[in-house]
């Protein structure tokens, strides 16, 4: 495998991997705690082990296996992977807050939307540092999470492109981008139920059948 190590000074590196329900993402910091690398957003489509192996191989090639001092995991699949590999693990909620504060020390509100969880953190800052003022997350229902929005983008693809379209897994990112951009064209969001994804989907189908503009339906969903 071709190496890209010439891009980095000789140093020691620390890798954090978010093994989520939908995607696999990684960041690398150096000994000065400076961010030196962030991987592209990568959907694993259930092929978690294969995608993880490819990701780690790429990181070893780029930074040098001997120069990577530690690897840590977070995310839905992070704990199981960390136990299997004998490496560090941190709860995703803690990782999200500490990670954002490291990049934006004065942040007051953090919203995390994952494949199956959405979370809200409100941070209070004072003379003695920061503290968590409020936290909330969704329950067992996946309403308002990334997976449901993905599903609706795929479902509406035929209407969006005005022709029958079979969406491959590799095309979903482009479809999702078009889905979001179409919704941004609306200035009149349709009324869509926010209680549950079952009701939300039913409302969206009903609005389509009534002839509501697609961009208004998508904007209402968001």
Give the positions of each predicted feature.
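Short acidic, glycine/serine/threonine-rich loops at helix termini
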Residues: 27-30, 81-86, 119-126, 133-136, ...
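Active-site nucleophile and cofactor-binding loops and adjacent substrate-binding regions
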Residues: 43-45, 70-73, 87-98, 111-115, ...
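Gly/Thr-rich phosphate-binding beta-strand-loop-beta motif of the actin/hexokinase/Hsp70
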Residues: 2-33, 107-126, 196
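Residues on a specific face of well-ordered alpha-helices
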Residues: 50, 54, 98, 102, ...
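Short beta-strand-loop/turn "lid" adjacent to the catalytic site in phosphate-handling enzymes
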Residues: 40-44, 60-93, 121-122
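Adenine-nucleotide phosphate-binding core of ATP-dependent small-molecule kinases
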Residues: 200-222
């Amino acid at each position: 495998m071709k190496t890209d190590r010439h891009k980095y000074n000789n140093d020691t590196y620390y890798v954090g991997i978010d093994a989520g329900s939908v995607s696999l993402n990684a960041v690398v910091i150096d000994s000065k705690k400076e961010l030196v690398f962030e991987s592209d957003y990568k959907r694993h489509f259930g092929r978690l082990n294969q995608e993880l192996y490819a990701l780690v191989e790429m990181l070893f090639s780029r930074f040098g296996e001997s120069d990577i001092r530690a690897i840590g995991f977070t995310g839905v699949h992070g704990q199981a992977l960390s136990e299997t590999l004998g490496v560090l693990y941190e709860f995703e909620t803690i990782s999200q807050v500490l990670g954002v504060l490291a990049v934006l020390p004065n942040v007051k509100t953090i919203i995390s939307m994952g494949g199956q969880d959405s979370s809200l953190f409100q941070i209070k800052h004072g003379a003695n540092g920061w503290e968590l003022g409020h936290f909330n997350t969704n329950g067992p229902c996946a309403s308002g999470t990334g997976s449901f929005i993905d599903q609706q983008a795929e479902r509406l693809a035929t209407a969006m492109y005005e022709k029958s379209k079979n969406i491959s897994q590799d095309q979903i990112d482009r479809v999702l981008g078009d889905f979001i951009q179409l919704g941004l064209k609306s200035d009149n969001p349709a009324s869509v139920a926010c209680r549950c994804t079952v009701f939300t989907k039913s409302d969206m189908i009903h609005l389509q059948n009534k002839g509501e503009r697609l961009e208004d339906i998508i904007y209402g969903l968001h």
